[in-house]
């Protein structure tokens, strides 16, 4: 298989990855994160319960960005999540949860309209996060008809974020994946 054919297959994979119609299209909450750097931890047991989120490792103080255009529904200090943000999308269909923040962006308050990619906070290790492992705990919830910030159906953010990163071409394909495709094709 030629390198050109392998590149075309990668392109087709990217197009397919971006076509999941039932999931929200989101931006990365941490600029520069690549799809291959993510690890699915949704079903892992953390502190006695299912994690239902993804942890994105980043240095303390790294900007956290809104993944969609929306409204800050709730800023909340919790024992487990520390400084948290609950963002609703414009349709009120999904809630995006950002936790363990070092701090919020200046001027951010409940009811603030935010744009996709806008800085809303900074990575930290507040709540029950280890100071040795600062990260963003990121979750997605499908809201019910009541649209409560504290209640929704958890959606695994890993495949949603991975597909969005690949589809947006913000993620480079590691050379080892191309080589594996070439090897598999014989």
Regions found by a protein language model. Name each.
Residues 2-83, 116, 125, 154-186:
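Surface-exposed, glycine-biased beta-strand/turn segments
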Residues 41, 59, 90, 101, ...:
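Generic beta-structure capping elements
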Residues 43-45, 63, 77-80, 91-94, ...:
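Solvent-exposed loop/turn segments at secondary-structure junctions
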Residues 47, 102-103, 109, 146, ...:
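Short linear sequence elements within intrinsically disordered, low-complexity coil regions
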Residues 67-110, 133-139:
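Zn2+-dependent peptidoglycan hydrolase active-site motif and core
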Residues 86, 94, 112-172:
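Conserved, short, structured surface segments that act as functional micro-motifs
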């Amino acid at each position: 298989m030629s390198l050109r054919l392998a590149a075309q297959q990668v392109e087709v994979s990217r197009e397919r990855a971006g076509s999941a119609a039932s999931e929200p299209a989101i931006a990365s909450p941490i600029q520069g994160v690549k799809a291959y750097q993510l690890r699915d931890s949704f079903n892992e047991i953390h502190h006695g319960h299912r994690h239902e989120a993804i942890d994105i490792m980043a240095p303390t103080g790294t900007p956290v960005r809104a993944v969609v255009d929306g409204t800050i529904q709730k800023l909340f200090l919790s024992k487990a999540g520390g400084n948290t943000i609950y963002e609703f999308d414009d349709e009120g269909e999904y809630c995006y949860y950002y936790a363990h923040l070092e701090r919020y962006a200046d001027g951010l308050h409940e009811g603030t309209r935010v744009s996709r990619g806008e800085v809303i906070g900074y990575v930290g290790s507040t709540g029950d996060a280890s100071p040795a492992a600062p990260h963003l705990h990121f979750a997605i919830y499908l809201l019910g008809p009541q649209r409560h910030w504290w209640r929704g159906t958890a959606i695994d953010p890993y495949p949603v974020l991975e597909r969005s990163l690949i589809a947006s071409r913000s993620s480079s394909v590691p050379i080892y994946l191309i080589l594996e495709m070439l090897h598999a094709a014989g």
